[in-house]
């Protein structure tokens, strides 16, 4: 939780505790209600979040959870210490990679946004690790640009989303180098 005060999140914490679950709060705000209601807390300390899109706190929370997963994997013996060290080094390199990305995509952003700024709807499709990226991308588009958008698992697109498309609908596909890349590429061909 970014603020640690969202009513829905606090209700989920209460339900989880009533069911006997151990609750971990990952938040940016020290002393928030979520921190008081949880069994353990990880503070991201990402600084004040000014924008509604909460990009900074989202990225910090993903990084915190990834670090937790790496440590658990090391303790359980599913990842050797050397690999954990390598992966933590990759996390630390993210700011430089973000700078490179911003520099490399700026022209494309101008061109693509100029072509699609007046569209009434965007569809995001992804599989595997690309699906949560699509969900967050669709949310960011709604929050920042006020453009209606939705995100779906690409394998489910025939069960509704494809009916929303016409020849002008922008479809954002996140295709990662994953074991199911071929299936994602097939989905991309279907929406062309």
Features from the language model and the residues they span:
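Glycine-rich phosphate-binding loops that contact phosphosugars or nucleotide phosphates
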Residues: 1-93, 176-179, 183-192
């Amino acid at each position: 939780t970014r603020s640690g005060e969202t009513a829905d999140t606090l209700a989920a914490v209460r339900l989880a505790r009533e069911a006997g679950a151990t609750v971990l709060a990952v938040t940016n705000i020290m002393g928030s209600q979520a921190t008081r209601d949880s069994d353990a807390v990880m503070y991201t300390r990402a600084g004040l979040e000014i924008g509604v899109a909460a990009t900074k706190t989202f990225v910090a929370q993903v990084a915190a959870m990834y670090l937790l997963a790496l440590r658990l994997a090391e303790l359980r013996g599913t990842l050797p210490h050397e690999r954990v060290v390598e992966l933590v080094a990759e996390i630390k390199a993210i700011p430089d990679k973000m700078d490179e990305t911003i520099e490399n995509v700026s022209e494309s952003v101008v061109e693509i946004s100029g072509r699609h700024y007046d569209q009434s709807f965007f569809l995001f499709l992804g599989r595997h690790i690309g699906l949560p990226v699509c969900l967050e991308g669709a949310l960011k588009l709604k929050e920042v640009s006020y453009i209606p958008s939705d995100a779906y698992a690409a394998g489910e697109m025939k069960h509704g989303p494809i009916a929303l498309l016409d020849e002008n609908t922008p479809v954002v596909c996140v295709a990662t180098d994953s074991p199911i890349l071929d299936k994602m590429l097939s989905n991309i061909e279907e929406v062309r």
